[in-house]
């Protein structure tokens, strides 16, 4: 059996390629040749060309047929067309920007994606909603026009080793710099789906393993547990020698240093349903997300991006600690100036009689008996 991977050198690529080789596929990867990551088996054939140039891709693949082709890079719709009639099972990788509200929360009414969003959720239908998302949605349509039995996998934000936009670096560097505080918006309660590299590769390989189920289907991919932003920060701090710091919660409008972590102009949730891939293909995380975050943090600490380098430029995080300290000081001064009102009859609003946790109503019985 022969397999082709277009790309194969990004964060999830080597895991997918190794999985194909382990399954007995004679595997070829088509990529630019600029990156040759560790972990690609020696037996893998490399075709070096420009995956964004259809004519060069056509020339590189002239006269070849593959049992499986996985397109993770390049001009996805054109590669689907080029491989029409020349592949047994075409798999493509896209992303969550296809969903209305993912990149532009205001495209939904009220703002924000439905939680969770299923594969049949509303997609971007007009460039005014989001230009990138519109192109992603149209690309999906073109893929299935060229490959009616394709499997399309929608990726979330990817994290793990060799991620060129490592969101976790905004946390890890502050720990390495021994920062005593980190600013989070609205208590860090935002939820945003992410996927660890090994978990996403596992999802792709499940679709390869079960073509009778996966052909003609679209699947959301991601970790099964979605951690809040605060949980992400606390998990990474624990993994890095229990770094002691204070999480300073501010309203989103003031928490400007947290923008690179939230990665959108709102704190709306971005969570999808994994029910389809779980029930149809049996997906389960191979690496629990909390362990995956710890691995990612330790990898970043050992492979530190250059200060002011490409990764930090992509993240748009200036790591301006003096400005952050001034913001914290000003915010706390403003909070201290707020006087709470005197409540009518001395009774402040409560949490409701149904709540019986810490700070709630006392137990009606002193004992269980």
Where are these regions (language model features)?
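A short helix->loop->beta-strand "cap" motif at the edges of active sites that frequently abuts
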Residues: 85-90, 148
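Conserved Rossmann-fold cofactor-binding substructure of NAD(P)-dependent oxidoreductases
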Residues: 48-71, 80
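Alpha-helical substrate-binding/gating segment
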Residues: 173-182, 190-227, 234-238
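Conserved beta-loop-beta element that borders a ligand/cofactor-binding pocket
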Residues: 139-162
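Mid/C-terminal beta-alpha module of Rossmann-like enzyme folds, strongest
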Residues: 209-276, 280, 294-295, 307-369
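N-terminal Rossmann-fold cofactor-binding loop
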Residues: 29-34, 51
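N-terminal Rossmann NAD(P)H-binding glycine-rich loop of SDR-like oxidoreductase domains
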Residues: 3-23
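Active-site "gating" loop of Rossmann-like NAD(P)-dependent oxidoreductase/epimerase domains
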Residues: 95-134, 138-146
């Amino acid at each position: 059996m022969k397999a082709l991977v277009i790309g194969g050198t990004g964060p999830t690529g080597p895991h997918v390629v190794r999985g194909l080789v382990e399954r007995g596929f004679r595997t070829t990867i088509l990529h630019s040749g600029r990156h040759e990551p560790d972990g690609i088996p020696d037996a893998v054939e490399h075709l070096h060309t420009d995956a964004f140039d259809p004519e060069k891709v056509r020339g590189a693949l002239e006269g070849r047929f593959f049992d499986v082709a996985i397109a993770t890079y390049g001009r996805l719709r054109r590669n689907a067309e080029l491989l029409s009639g020349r592949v047994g099972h075409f798999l493509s990788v896209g992303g969550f920007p296809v969903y209305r509200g993912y990149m532009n929360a205001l495209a939904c009414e009220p703002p924000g994606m439905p939680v969770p969003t299923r594969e049949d959720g509303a997609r971007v239908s007009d460039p005014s909603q989001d230009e990138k998302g519109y192109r992603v949605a149209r690309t999906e349509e073109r893929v299935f026009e060229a490959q009616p039995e394709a499997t399309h996998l929608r990726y979330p934000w990817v994290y793990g080793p060799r991620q060129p936009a490592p969101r976790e670096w905004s946390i890890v560097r502050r720990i390495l710099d021994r920062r005593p505080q980190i600013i989070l918006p609205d208590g860090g309660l935002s939820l945003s789906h992410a996927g660890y590299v090994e978990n996403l590769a596992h999802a792709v390989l499940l679709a390869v393993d079960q073509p009778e189920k996966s052909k003609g289907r679209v699947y959301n991919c991601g970790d099964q547990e979605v951690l809040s932003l605060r949980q992400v920060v606390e998990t990474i701090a624990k993994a890095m020698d229990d770094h002691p710091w204070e999480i300073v919660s501010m309203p989103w409008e003031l928490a400007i240093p947290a923008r690179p972590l939230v990665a959108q102009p709102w704190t709306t949730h971005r969570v999808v349903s994994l029910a389809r891939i779980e029930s149809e293909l049996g997906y389960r995380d191979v690496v629990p997300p909390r362990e995956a975050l710890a691995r990612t943090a330790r990898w970043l600490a050992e492979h530190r991006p250059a200060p002011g380098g490409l990764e930090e430029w992509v993240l748009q995080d200036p790591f301006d600690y003096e400005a952050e300290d001034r913001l914290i000081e000003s915010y706390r001064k403003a909070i201290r100036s707020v006087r709470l009102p005197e409540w009518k009859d001395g009774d402040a609003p409560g949490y409701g009689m149904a709540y019986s946790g810490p700070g709630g109503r006392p137990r009606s019985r002193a004992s269980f008996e």
